Amino acid sequence: MPYNFCLPSLSCRTSCSSRPCVPPSCHGYTLPGACNIPANVSNCNWFCEGSFNGSEKETMQFLNDRLASYLEKVRQLERDNAELENLIRERSQQQEPLLCPSYQSYFKTIEELQQKILCSKSENARLVVQIDNAKLAADDFRTKYQTEQSLRQLVESDINSLRRILDELTLCRSDLEAQMESLKEELLSLKQNHEQEVNTLRCQLGDRLNVEVDAAPAVDLNQVLNETRNQYEALVETNRREVEQWFATQTEELNKQVVSSSEQLQSYQAEIIELRRTVNALEIELQAQHNLRYSLENTLTESEARYSSQLSQVQSLITNVESQLAEIRSDLERQNQEYQVLLDVRARLECEINTYRSLLESEDCKLPSNPCATTNACEKPIGSCVTNPCGPRSRCGPCNTFGY
């Protein structure tokens, strides 16, 4: 910042009312904060005209030159500082739309991916539970299928045994029919033989004479034969009826058993077909679930790989941004150090200005209001007026100021 100041006049038009102004010490000293500027003050002799000697004028000229150079350096440093601040502001404005939205979008993408991963995990767990349930159902159906298969084998064995019994009954029936045919043939042969014998006897008796003899009544052979024949026929008919009735009952029972067995066999076959269809459908569904699980696992692996690569890219971007921020911080620290240096320079410059002002004030105090009293004032040995060169000084009286 520019420093505006005014220098006190080289001549004092008013006199000190309370006490006489004394000059500084006649010994040489160095101004603090003035980088070892020679500020030797000459002897205590004063001109009556109130002007400075040659050494004091050179010191004031040197201080003015140093002050001008310091002010120019301060202005240059302020311009450099403003340029650096503008450059930092431009870089921050250029990088701001790249940092904040990109981080927010990456965070949103990461949250969405985490939600998708959680949904995939829950879906995988649900599929695993469904697969376990399907496995349990398949095991139940397998046990039922094995039970029904054993029942089917038992029914088939019963059917085979019944078929053997049916074959045996068929053989018995054929045997009985053969026996009945043989009995019929035997009956016919007996009838033929009986008729032949009757005819033969009739022929023999027809040629003989009829002799009436008182004897027991003759036996009617035809009647006996008819009775015998009737008895045999009744017996044969009874046996035939019994055999037919037994055969009918056995056949009916076998037919009922065969019908019931065939119905059970058909029901078992239909149930077996249905169970096979169910098992095939469950196997197809299980294979589809396995394929879905494999595809989901592959998709999850690909998603994890892709998102890990994206995360590594984001981490690298974050690392680059952090390095840029570290550079900016280092630049800011360097600028702060430069600013501290400028503040130190300013403090030293203000100290020099205060020293310069105190020197001018002390020189103003040296100028006497009465030129004739100069010798008396200078003859008194008084110590130095400058006790603290860097502090403000009180003036002996009002003085005019001008720009040097």
From Swiss-Prot:
The record marks A305 as: Stutter. Belongs to the intermediate filament family. Residues 56-367 form the IF rod domain. The lineage of its organism: Eukaryota, Metazoa, Chordata, Craniata, Vertebrata. GO terms for cellular component: cytoskeleton; cytosol; extracellular exosome; extracellular space; intermediate filament. Residues 220-363 are annotated as: Coil 2. The gene is KRT33B. Residues 364-404 are annotated as: Tail. Keywords: Coiled coil, Intermediate filament, Keratin. GO terms for biological process: epithelial cell differentiation; hair cycle; intermediate filament organization. PANTHER family: INTERMEDIATE FILAMENT, KERATIN, TYPE I CUTICULAR HA3-II. There are two types of hair/microfibrillar keratin, I (acidic) and II (neutral to basic). Residues 92-102 are annotated as: Linker 1. This is Keratin, type I cuticular Ha3-II. It comes from the Eukaryota. GO terms for molecular function: structural molecule activity.
